[in-house]
Amino acid sequence: MLQRTLAKSISVTGVGLHSGERVALTLHPAPENSGISFRRTDLDGEMGEQIKLTPYLINDTRLSSTIVTDKGVRVGTIEHIMSALSAYGIDNALIELNAPEIPIMDGSSLPFIYLLQDAGVVDQKAQKRFLKILKPVEIKEAGKWVRFTPYDGFKVTLTIEFDHPVFNRSSPTFEIDFAGKSYIDEIARARTFGFMHEVEMMRAHNLGLGGNLNNAIVIDDTDVLNPEGLRYPDEFVRHKILDAIGDLYIVGHPIIGAFEGYKSGHAINNALLRAVLADETAYDRVEFADSDDLPDAFHELNIRTCG
């Protein structure tokens, strides 16, 4: 299977969830073996240089997965666009933006899916590399845990836990095996969520300034405040899976393995990636010259190119 990039550049505007700033974002094709990179067009000189994404650049995970370089350049809330790039198997792309944060759009990855559909996807000449998990790797901290285990495909199982009436009405656990289920159908529409009291607290600290009922599920003491309700009965845990897929794709390759988590979040997801990369016996980078040898979870990627 070959690496892929966008067929053309494409742009969108939106608002940063935490900054409230208007953001212009453009996705560009990129050369093979270049990976996913970001560039802040509002910064000059070294501060405006291209940033090659790696797990070691995620240095702020308080409210999202945020790049913070050694020069102090920030690119925040990258997990939703990374999740969409993962769904399309995009290996190489340059993402330019004129603000410190990726726009939140509607709080899901669906607008970025539409953006990628409009741009189109093309195969390149180099072979796509996959990160294959060879042995279990687990991180536990403060009552939370995440782990990778070997698996011939890509499967995600997450459980959330909130002591709140809204969450008691839906299953706290969701599992998706991408050999038989579609990311676009099952995950892409799930929106970020937050509690009304947290929104008020964040705004007091100049955070969450761009959040509203059009780009997040907002919950009060008893109910969802969004008049349209939920997009899935278990939208909350599905969004956590959306986030996790984006966080994991920061490693730069599709993952062949199973990911499980209990009360997972950006910090612990990133810690798991770093733990895997720190143990050379835990993974291998593999290629599939013959697409028939691909695990079933990745066969759908073959139909998402425009030649």
From Swiss-Prot:
Catalysed reactions listed for this entry: a UDP-3-O-[(3R)-3-hydroxyacyl]-N-acetyl-alpha-D-glucosamine + H2O = a UDP-3-O-[(3R)-3-hydroxyacyl]-alpha-D-glucosamine + acetate
An example Gene Ontology biological process: lipid A biosynthetic process
GO CC annotation terms, alphabetical: membrane
Active site feature: 266 (proton donor)
Disulfide bonds: none
Statement: the UniProt record of this protein carries the keyword Metal-binding: yes
Alphabetized UniProt keyword annotations: Hydrolase, Lipid A biosynthesis, Lipid biosynthesis, Lipid metabolism, Metal-binding, Zinc
Positions that bind Zn(2+): 80, 239, 243
Matches recorded under Gene3D superfamilies: lpxc deacetylase, domain 1, lpxc deacetylase, domain 2
Enzyme Commission number: 3.5.1.108
Cofactor: Zn(2+)
Pathway: Glycolipid biosynthesis; lipid IV(A) biosynthesis; lipid IV(A) from (3R)-3-hydroxytetradecanoyl-[acyl-carrier-protein] and UDP-N-acetyl-alpha-D-glucosamine: step 2/6
InterPro entries: Ribosomal_Su5_D2-typ_SF (IPR020568), UDP-acyl_GlcNac_deAcase (IPR004463), UDP-acyl_GlcNac_deAcase_C (IPR011334), UDP-acyl_N-AcGlcN_deAcase_N (IPR015870)
SUPFAM superfamilies: Ribosomal protein S5 domain 2-like
A Pfam family annotated for this UniProt entry: LpxC
Molecular functions (GO terms): metal ion binding; UDP-3-O-acyl-N-acetylglucosamine deacetylase activity
Function according to Swiss-Prot or TrEMBL: Catalyzes the hydrolysis of UDP-3-O-myristoyl-N-acetylglucosamine to form UDP-3-O-myristoylglucosamine and acetate, the committed step in lipid A biosynthesis.
UniProt family annotation: Belongs to the LpxC family.
Name of the protein: UDP-3-O-acyl-N-acetylglucosamine deacetylase
Species annotation: Neisseria meningitidis serogroup A / serotype 4A (strain DSM 15465 / Z2491)
Gene this chain is encoded by: lpxC
